[in-house]
């Protein structure tokens, strides 16, 4: 959830921009802070989840995870409307998606012996998470 903390800081910095335009020095400090926050987040991608299309900023590491890839494959079967090729839509309830993110964050993929078992469960988990 550290991503959301960074986004909150960036959002508050952007909100302060108009009020600081009178003081050029403060504006420059705020602008440089916002730019540094954005550069830290360059590895993030927007993913829209659920029927409400709630946006999430996910790292490439999460998007490359086999479970997330399976979820995307299954979601493409349910979602017919694609406005452009860069839009990533996931057919999953928001609450379940947040649980999935929590699982991915807290899982340890250092277990070499469990790879076969994990591959088999990826399909089952993706089936559970999609509508």
Curated annotation (Swiss-Prot):
ATP-binding recorded as keyword: no
Matches recorded under PANTHER family: EXPRESSED PROTEIN, SMALL AUXIN-UP RNA-RELATED
Misc remark: Plants silencing SAUR77 exhibit increased sensitivity to ethylene, while plants over-expressing SAUR77 display reduced ethylene sensitivity. Plants over-expressing SAUR77 exhibit increased rosette diameters.
A Pfam family that the UniProt record links to this protein: Auxin_inducible
Name of the protein this chain belongs to: Auxin-responsive protein SAUR77
Keyword Oxidoreductase: no
Native source species: Arabidopsis thaliana (Mouse-ear cress)
Annotated keywords: Developmental protein, Ethylene signaling pathway, Growth regulation
Top-level taxon: Eukaryota
UniProt-listed GO biological process terms: ethylene-activated signaling pathway; response to auxin
Protein family per UniProt: Belongs to the ARG7 family.
Intrachain disulfide bonds: none
Gene this protein is translated from: SAUR77
Primary role: May be involved in the regulation of ethylene receptor signaling. Promotes cell expansion and plant growth.
């Amino acid at each position: 959830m550290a991503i959301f903390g960074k986004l909150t800081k960036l959002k508050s910095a952007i909100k302060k921009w108009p009020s600081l335009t009178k003081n050029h020095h403060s504006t420059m400090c705020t602008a440089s802070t916002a730019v540094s926050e954005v550069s830290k987040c360059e590895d993030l991608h927007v993913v829209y989840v659920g029927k409400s299309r709630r946006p999430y900023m996910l790292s490439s590491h999460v998007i490359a995870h086999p479970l997330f890839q399976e979820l995307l494959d299954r979601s493409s079967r349910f979602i017919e409307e694609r406005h452009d090729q860069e839009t990533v839509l996931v057919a999953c309830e928001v609450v379940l998606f947040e649980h999935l993110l929590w699982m991915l964050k807290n899982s340890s993929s250092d277990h070499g012996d469990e790879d076969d078992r994990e591959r088999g469960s990826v399909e089952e988990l993706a089936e559970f998470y999609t509508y």
